[in-house]
Amino acid sequence: MSDKASTPKKSATKDATKPKKVGDEEAKKREVKKNFDSYALYISRVLKSVFPDIGITLPSISVMDSFVRDIFERIAMDASSLTRNYQKSTLTTKEIETATKLILKGDLNKHAVSEGQSAVKRAQGQPTSGSKSR
């Protein structure tokens, strides 16, 4: 019994003697950054492009980030439900537009739909008519 008590556990000796790689810590940092989704950078960039002289505080960015996430999740959930209800396997711009109409009301809906349509046209390489370039 004294032999077993005096010998260290194999896993403890492997961990202690195992040399650490230089890239291990950097890889962990990159993993953390990958998993953290935030719109804060984009919110501040859009604000600076629209109003160059105005700044925004970190709590305000946090509120805006939460708002954007919430709206995104709502639109995604409604669009997904519409796709399932229509018994389709592909989510199209039609479902996104319909979900947006269900969530946003009034002028906000009109602006969101028109901006979304112009963004889709730009992505497809079609010229957009009547849209403002910022």
Curated annotation (Swiss-Prot):
Its main location: nucleus. It holds the Pfam family Histone. Keywords: Chromosome, DNA-binding, Nucleosome core, Nucleus. Residues 12-29 have a biased composition (Basic and acidic residues). GO terms for molecular function: DNA binding; protein heterodimerization activity; structural constituent of chromatin. Coiled coil: none annotated. Residues 1-10, 125-134 have a biased composition (Polar residues). Core component of nucleosome. Nucleosomes wrap and compact DNA into chromatin, limiting DNA accessibility to the cellular machineries which require DNA as a template. Histones thereby play a central role in transcription regulation, DNA repair, DNA replication and chromosomal stability. DNA accessibility is regulated via a complex set of post-translational modifications of histones, also called histone code, and nucleosome remodeling. It comes from Entamoeba invadens. One of its GO terms (cellular component) is nucleosome. Residues 1-29, 113-134 are annotated as: Disordered. The nucleosome is a histone octamer containing two molecules each of H2A, H2B, H3 and H4 assembled in one H3-H4 heterotetramer and two H2A-H2B heterodimers. The octamer wraps approximately 147 bp of DNA. This is Histone H2B. Belongs to the histone H2B family. It is found in: Nucleus; Chromosome.
